[in-house]
Structures are given as structure tokens and as C-alpha cells.
């Protein structure tokens, strides 16, 4: 999420840039899910032991730590559904045995580079408050949110020595984001998008509070609409329909029309999952040459070939060669 001041709002734009990064991704262990005719009852199979998973788990989070700093996992899986509960147990094992939690001489939780918060989304939101209860996640992650901060930069004028010369503008980094939230549910679509919307709102509220400002309700409506559009776009790519719960994300409340729309999307997903995805997967496997006994496939990319050939023709303009003895 990146926000920048609007030059049209003043004669001289302030040049303030706000940015906040989040990550979403499925549980980083080795597992697969079979199609099923009953929604939510698709069988989950773990294909590698916790010990066998740990090296890949550590590599994944090591790369995240290098790129973003501290990582706070927000796991939204169910505690009661057997498959999701098993994934949660494996996730918990990986976090507990991660090298990021065993920094030498720093056993305090304040120095952990990898933390985990488990928030059973369905259990927390099944009460009378519905999806509004999802906002309870705030108190569980607010310490990390405050510690991670956000990225903020500002353009300032460099005074020119000659009064007749135009002063140049340069960007000064005021604040750096020091960590990142990695949010997941099972497919990282509906539940994940709603919680990421809340985390994004927390970051924006912190930014505005530090500036002594408050956003109007219209601003938050636009913010919610952006996140609802984001959830719908990702869901169409992955599941073939818009995201569930997008009505709540967009309007802040769940209407009857929104509930009916979610039911329709669930039925469409069920059909696609059982009758369309298998054919698409077979097509992808054929294209990549992964079918049993298939002749290897060589993909033809004329644009890449053209660019490579043109670069080779003009290589003397940007490279040189020299013979050496070793």
C-alpha cells in the first residue's frame, strides 16, 4: 500500500510518501488438498514430517527477515476442523524451532524475529457481532504494529547557491518499516483479505495520528473499497469468483444481499473446484511436459528470442571481452 500527497490540493505539493507492506501466503509446510463435494470438508494431506519441513521453513522465513525485518505470523485457521488444526500444529512447530527465535543471548520475546498469533476467524466471528468481531485482532497485534511502524519519506528543497537557479528537490526518508505481518488462512483469500484490511487501517491510523490528523468517513470508505477490489481480483485468479465477505469489507456491514452473494460464490467455487480445475491442471501439465511418458516440451517465446538476438547484435555497446590466463 502506497500513498502520496495530491499535487492538486495545494500550490506546492508536500511530497509526502507513505508506504506499508504486508504479506499473505499459505502455511509454509508441505501439504496438499483434494477436491470434495462438501464445502470446507476437502481432505488435507501433509506430505512431509515436521523435521523434514524445517529446513525449507527456515529458508523461507530467513528470506523474509532479510527483506522485511521481523515477521509476525497471523494464522486464521480453524482450531476445530481436523485438517486446519493439523496445519496449525505444524506451523506452530516450525515457528518454535525456527532459528529466528533463538537469537544468541536474546531470549526475551521482545527480541524474537518471528512471532505467531493464532486467531480462529470463524470461531471469533460466529457470535452476534458477526464479522465486526474480527476487529478483536487489533489488541493481539498492536504491539508489533507499533514496533513495525511504516515507511515515510518527504521531498525537501535544496536551496540553490545562485538565487536565479531553481532549487532542486530531494527525497529524505523520515521513517522505515521495521517488520511485516504475514497473514494466512487456508487459501489466503477471504479471511486473509479482511484481516489485512484491518492491519492496513491500523497503519493508516498510526500515520495520521502522528501528523495530528483524522481521516473523514469518505476516506475510509475508499480504503475499504480498494481492499475489497483487491480481494475480488485475487480470488478470481485463484478460485474463479470474487472474494467472500467482500460486502462486509466494502461497506463495513453484512447485508442480506451480501450473504446471498457469498452463497452464490461458494456454489460456483464448488463447481469449478470439482469439474473445471482438473481439466485446467491437466492442460498446464501438458504444456509444461509433466505428464507421464510425455515428450519434453520446449516453450517458444518469440519476444524473448527477439530481444536476446538484438542484445547480442549490440553487445559491443555495453560489454567488452578480454583474454586472461589462469
Regions found by a protein language model. Name each.
Residues 1-174, 203-326:
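Phosphoinositide system proteins, centered on phosphoinositide phosphatases
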Residues 179-198:
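A phosphate-binding catalytic loop at a beta-strand-loop-alpha-helix junction
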Amino acid at each position: 500500500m502506497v500513498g502520496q500527497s495530491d499535487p492538486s490540493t495545494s500550490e506546492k505539493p508536500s511530497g509526502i510518501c507513505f508506504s506499508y507492506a504486508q504479506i499473505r501466503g499459505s502455511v509454509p509446510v508441505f501439504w496438499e488438498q483434494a477436491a470434495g463435494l462438501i464445502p470446507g470438508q476437502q481432505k488435507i494431506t501433509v506430505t512431509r514430517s515436521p523435521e523434514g519441513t524445517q529446513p525449507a521453513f527456515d529458508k523461507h522465513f530467513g528470506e523474509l527477515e532479510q527483506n522485511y525485518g521481523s515477521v509476525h505470523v497471523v494464522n486464521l485457521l480453524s482450531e476445530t476442523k481436523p485438517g486446519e488444526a493439523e496445519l496449525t500444529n505444524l506451523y506452530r512447530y516450525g515457528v518454535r524451532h525456527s532459528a529466528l527465535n533463538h537469537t544468541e543471548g536474546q531470549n526475551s520475546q521482545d527480541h524474537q524475529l518471528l512471532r505467531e498469533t493464532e486467531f480462529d476467524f470463524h470461531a471469533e466471528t460466529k457470535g452476534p457481532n458477526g464479522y465486526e468481531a474480527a476487529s478483536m485482532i487489533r489488541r493481539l497485534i498492536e504491539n508489533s504494529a507499533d514496533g513495525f511502524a511504516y515507511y515515510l519519506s518527504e521531498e525537501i528543497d535544496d536551496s540553490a547557491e545562485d538565487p536565479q537557479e531553481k532549487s532542486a528537490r530531494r527525497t529524505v526518508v523520515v521513517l522505515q518499516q521495521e517488520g511485516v505481518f504475514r497473514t494466512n488462512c487456508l487459501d489466503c483469500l477471504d479471511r486473509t483479505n479482511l484481516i489485512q484490511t484491518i492491519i492496513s487501517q491500523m497503519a493508516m491510523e498510526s500515520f495520521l495520528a502522528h501528523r495530528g490528523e483524522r481521516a473523514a468517513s469518505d476516506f475510509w470508505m475508499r480504503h475499504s473499497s480498494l481492499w475489497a477490489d483487491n480481494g475480488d481480483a485475487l480470488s478470481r485468479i485463484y478460485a474463479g469468483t470474487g472474494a467472500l465477505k467482500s460486502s462486509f469489507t466494502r461497506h463495513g456491514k453484512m447485508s442480506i444481499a451480501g450473504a446471498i452473494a457469498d452463497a452464490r460464490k461458494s456454489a460456483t467455487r464448488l463447481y469449478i473446484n470439482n469439474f473445471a480445475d482438473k481439466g485446467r491442471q491437466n492442460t498446464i501439465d501438458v504444456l509444461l511436459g509433466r505428464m507421464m511418458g510425455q515428450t519434453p516440451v520446449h516453450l517458444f517465446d518469440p519476444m524473448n528470442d527477439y530481444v536476446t538476438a538484438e542484445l547480442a547484435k549490440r553487445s559491443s555497446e555495453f560489454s567488452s571481452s578480454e583474454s586472461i590466463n589462469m
